[in-house]
Amino acid sequence: MGSKIKLLVVDDEKQFLETICRRLELRNFEVVPVSSGEEAVEAARKQDFEIALVDLKMPGMGGEKVLEILKKEHPWLEVIILTGHGSIDSAVRSTKLGAYYYLQKPCDLEHLLQVLIEAYQERIKRKYRYNDEKMKNILAPLVSASPLEKLRSLKQLDEKKKAELSI
């Protein structure tokens, strides 16, 4: 990988948090560790992450609430639940809230790495599908437009993009 995938790792167990972050950094991930749900939400509001690893059972804001907020505020963020207190019910709830994957601790590092790569690939696919759909919606009116209308629309689109880039 050329550039590093940026991960937010949320766990209240200090030793586990340090260990998993160190292992992921050795595998060329950029890792930001936080030890509470509140810190996770705050960090995600300040930085752009591609993936979040979230523990479920934490004091204060629990992992399900973190998942709910992260998916609402950052729809492109893939969230993987990594918990030592898992159950079928919590896995179902997490999936319904938008979790990409649900893992139980202890977790094999190679399996976690595979899930991280798949989550990153899914994120890219979703963004491309979204951008393709957005472009189709922008260009659809041009299909039936006269040549002069097409030219005006393309000019407006070009000016709009230039304005967005200059901000």
Residue spans of the language-model regions?
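Receiver (REC) domain active-site loop signature in two-component systems and cognate sites
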Residues: 58
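Active-site residues of response regulator receiver
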Residues: 11, 55, 83
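Acidic catalytic/metal-coordinating carboxylates
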Residues: 5, 35-39, 61-65
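C-terminal output helix
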Residues: 107-120
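Short amphipathic alpha-helix used as the core "switch/output" element in two-component signaling
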Residues: 42, 64-76
